[in-house]
Amino acid sequence: MKGVACTWMLLSMCLLGHLIIYGEANEAEALGDFLKSRLSKKPSPTVHSWAWLNEKTGNYPNYIQPQDGSMEADKIGALPGQPNGVDFNHYSGYVTVDSKAGRALFYYFAESPNNSSTNPLVLWLNGGPECSSLIGAMKELGPFRVNNDGETLFLANVIFLESPAGVGFSYSNTSSNYQHTGDKSTARDAYIFLINWLERFPQYKTRNFYITGESYAGHYVTQLAYTIFLNNKKANQTLINLKGIVVGNGWIDDHTGYWGQFDYLWTHALNSDETNKGIHTYGHYFNDKDPKECGDFVIKAYNEPGDIDGYNIYAPLCQQDSSSIKSSYDPVNNFDPCSTYYILSYLNRAEVQAALHAKVSTWDLCSDSIDSWIDSPATILPIIKNLMTSGLQIWLYSGDVDSVVPITSTRYAIQKLKLPVKTAWRPWSTNDEVGGYVEEYEGLTLVTVRDAGI
């Protein structure tokens, strides 16, 4: 029961992030462009089998560098604009994952002010692919809001990792690295980051550890978890005390993902009957095996919703003109559609980068330095099955107003797993109101969040 209660606590942390904010247009565009590349005849990632991640290829040597003094050097004194009375420690800096290539990943770590010595350790990953997890730190579930007095959640000690190299402040001194980035290299580097980070923060080596994330992190989270699972079997390897994974509105299976998108768009009055009928008539595989008409209707399906936030179909947009940014701030839901522009401005200030121990650079929400994404499996459901047999707690949660990776996609993917139901669909509540719904399967839990996007 302890493990289940802990997972509920971690899920609550992620859900509050969803209830407070709804998503980022640039991250939506990154995933949208990535998925459209799969449907077009343009160069797209190699849709390989998940089986590359196995006992042989998923094992990595103990690449551990000396970390003495690094934790103290990474401690943040105060961030510009930080409120008075902050009663927790936070850190940021780089962990080298390949000294020969000069490749290093940037992280921000916030300790819990309450019970930090016993609360679990959580790794948070934003998706994209190629989008920064500092979006999560400063807009979703981190301790601060930029230009906003947002709530703070202190249920865990959280690492926000900018991954892969080329995203945010993370970098490589070998430019060819940016031409060979994909799921494989991202999982490898994230694992090497973790074993070195635990050397830097040895007090967390035995702590219960959870991996969480959203969107394309449906790939990142599961592949990293399985990499840890494989390497934990090796002798003389750093043992990571992985207890579970939590994925929000995650892209985990191409076929059910696309069907879920198009069914959601039609049932939420964002697509015409004609377009929906065309999708169902000509769409079978959602790749180049389908007739040309399928591609035509797919384009119509993506264009018909118009200029809305795909990650929250009911949210206001940030109104920009040449002289200012106009915000339609919603004090009830604590949601400001312009918050990402504040973050973009804040993280590009020289004094902020200095306080974060970041290399002086131009920070962006999503990377344009990574030239291509070279590999991506069409489904990671087999990896989820393997993780289930290992005894890990697996939670999939979904905001019900996200049209990019909608609840329908998640439900269709779970149906594909053919899992027996342990506890039937039921509401869960927050502040005496229904916050969403939960259904427990054998080895997996599904949670929905009302009026929330990614």
Which role does the model predict for each range below?
Residues 2-454:
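Terminal and linker regions of secretory-pathway proteins
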